[in-house]
Amino acid sequence: MNIPERISALRALMEERGYDVYMVPTDDFHQSEYVGEHFKVREYITGFTGSAGTAVFTKDEAGLWTDGRYFLQADQQLAGTGVKLYKMGEPGVPTVEEFIASALPEGGTLGFDGRVVAIEEGAALEEAVASKDAKINYSEDLVGEVWADRPALSEKPAFALGEEYTGESTESKLARVREAMKKAGADVHVIAALDDVCWITNLRGDDVDFFPLLLSYAVITMDEMKLYIDERKLNDDMKADLAKNNITIHPYNAIYEDIKNLDTASTVLVDPTRLNYALFNNIPGGTKVVQQVNPTIAMKAKKNDVEIRNIINAHKKDAVAMTKWMYWLKTNIGKIEITELSAAAKLETLRKEQEGYLWQSFEPICASAEHAAIVHYEPTPETDVPLTQNGLFLTDT
């Protein structure tokens, strides 16, 4: 199916299920900035590949909201799809919430997958629909039903980081998190942010391109931690290390039902920007909830001596690769054909020579001549051009 056909299929489901407006954000179930292939739902339904944006569909309108980094790209990729670009922050452009409020009929229904909407955004949508006495249904992923060949969730294995890299044990990190919970007056902490779970457990993965993250959730109490993850990702040594810290392993999606069984006498700490709306709404009614930034955010920000030493070493290794690459460019430009893509490939080859290299941290931006004026330009076989001795060459890697 092409993009217009996909949108038509979505609208047919909207009609069948009683939705007047349906919203498709960029996020995964963990409110990640970048998402794995399984979660590229907004990209599938609009054709826009940028890392930020929200799509909204009505019975006869389709819109995509994105920021200034992607105006040019979105203009190009949305052409012929029937999706209108709404340039966020520009004069006269409504916000997503304002558009939804105006598009909903009295007593209508807004739909979205509550797993890919943060608590904070969910609250803003509740306020938006209230003016129309409308309802929210966050239980269905309609685009997922349209997407017949949707990639499965990543099954790539985890890997553990020793204290020679982390500088702190999981036991110590859990003790600090629990102390922060006490200060917040909470005895349960629900975490969905992938980087927070990975930091606490000293585990890493490859479930999101360019990021060492594992698809997982955590529920921490004062005496145990439940880790929700595909158990096949963990080897026996990892499981043993988790068990030493009274961390039990549970199926990845089981958290949604488990949360419903929390003791209503408990006080639950959640981050409204880093926990999804569906999970939040599964917390039993009457349970006291404290909404604040995950304590791990500040803990991760303050690097220990081991981390600082490793950061310095990593920069030195990358400096070696960059220096070799710039020398290669200067000595070979004009002698052999070097294109945007081949220059990027050469740099990665040189980085791979350095001990401990894993992968690049984002898709290389190698832009020659007029391509350098395109924000977040990424060369493709279709756009790749040769470098010239007199032109500008921009690199961000």
Which role fits each region the language model picked out?
Residues 391-393:
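Structural motif
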Residues 192, 366, 395:
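ATP-grasp fold ATP-binding core
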Residues 359-364, 397:
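Core alpha/beta catalytic barrel or barrel-like domain that forms the active/cofactor pocket
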Residues 348-352, 365-389:
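Flexible, glycine/threonine-enriched loop-and-boundary segments that flank and lead into catalytic domains
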Residues 186, 361-363, 389:
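Sequence-level motif detector for i,i+2 pairs with an aromatic at +2
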